[in-house]
Design a protein with these regions (language model features):
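Interdomain hinge/lid region at the active-site interface
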Residues: 164, 168, 212-280, 296
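Hydrophobic beta-strand scaffold residues
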Residues: 27, 47, 116-117, 158, ...
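NAD(P)+-binding Rossmann beta1-loop-alpha1 motif at the extreme N-terminus of oxidoreductases
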Residues: 1-63, 89, 94, 125
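Active-site-proximal catalytic alpha-helix in oxidoreductases
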Residues: 130-138, 159, 163-195, 206-218, ...
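Rossmann-fold dinucleotide-binding core
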Residues: 4, 97-175, 179
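Rossmann-like NAD(P)(H) cofactor-binding subdomain of soluble oxidoreductases
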Residues: 51-56, 60, 68-133
Length: 296
């Protein structure tokens, strides 16, 4: 069984590393805040100090961090993966970053003697905990096949989208749909509240028909309860939407829904909601309409 490394043990990375351990992989981890790694020690993981050390001890190395510059620093910065890379190392970036940056990083890695895949995920913290993630993979087919046993320990739906950067492009398409769905659910619930109809009955009916969506089923009950604890933070949602806007600008695309929902999330951030869950978008619509959609 191949040795697996994890760099980045946040909301997503920690449960993903735990699932790799439970699947029987030998796992080495590192994280900027070392205390995040300690729970994994009791489960059999080895904790080291730098990405360089993780690379030296791993055959498959997963990065799960916030941004393109973060991934670049982990791969090619001081004490980075590149300094510990060995022939056969496959670095798998499961963060959500720029498709353009991803292609550049793949070229640089190949020049340094190791290979990469981009494999961003959808499913949030619950999907990571339950090993039920959707994994969108970009890169060469031979390396996708090699990584498949690891992917199967982390997710239920694994799709090879295409070459380097394709996984990231697919993830950004997903994020556009997620954000606009959140807006649709928010507007529907506020509309129902303003017209004075039963909110729970309305939610159940819409969730049973053509207006249903993952957000209507999973987020609407929390919206109505005023539970905005993050499964996926607004700040991270906005980072992803900015990446999508940048890619759209590069291709001269007019995506008005994307632009609108990005501006509405900006308003939520400005009001101090950046660390709330992305379902908190309903609060912006409530302020615009002067109506609150909550169950008694």
């Amino acid at each position: 069984m191949e040795r697996v490394g994890f760099v980045g043990l946040g909301i997503m990375g920690l449960p993903m590393a735990r699932n790799a351990l439970r699947a029987g992989f030998p796992v080495t981890v590192t994280n900027r805040t070392r205390s995040r790694a300690e729970p994994l020690v009791a489960e059999g993981a080895t904790v080291v100090t730098t990405p360089r050390e993780v690379a030296a001890r791993s055959d498959l190395l997963v990065t799960m961090v916030t941004s393109s510059p973060d991934v670049e620093a982990l791969l090619f910065g001081p004490d980075g993966v590149g300094e510990g890379a060995h022939p056969g190392l496959l670095a798998i970036d499961m963060s959500t970053i720029s498709p353009i940056a991803t292609r550049s990083l793949a070229e640089r890695a190949a020049a340094r003697g190791f290979r990469t895949l981009d494999a961003p995920v959808s499913g949030g913290e619950i999907g990571a905990i339950e090993a039920a993630l959707v994994i969108m993979v970009g890169g060469d087919e031979v390396y996708v096949a090699r990584a498949m046993p690891l992917f199967r320990s982390l997710g239920k739906t694994i799709v090879h989208i295409g070459p380097h950067g394709a996984g990231q492009a697919c993830k950004l398409a997903n994020q556009i749909a997620v954000a606009i769905n959140n807006l649709g659910v928010s507007e529907a619930l506020v509309f129902a509240a303003a017209l004075g109809i039963d909110l729970e009955k309305t939610r159940q009916v819409v969730a049973s028909g053509a207006g249903s969506s993952w957000a209507m089923v999973n987020y609407a009950p929390k919206m109505l309860a005023g539970d905005f604890r993050p499964g996926f933070m607004v700040d991270l949602q906005q980072k992803d939407l900015r990446l999508a806007l940048d890619a759209a600008y590069e291709k001269h695309l007019s995506l008005p829904g994307l632009g609108l929902v990005h501006e509405l999330y900006n308003a939520l951030q400005q009001g101090g909601g950046g660390r709330e869950g992305n379902l908190a978008l309903i609060k912006v619509i409530e302020r615009l309409c002067g109506v609150q959609a909550r169950l008694p």
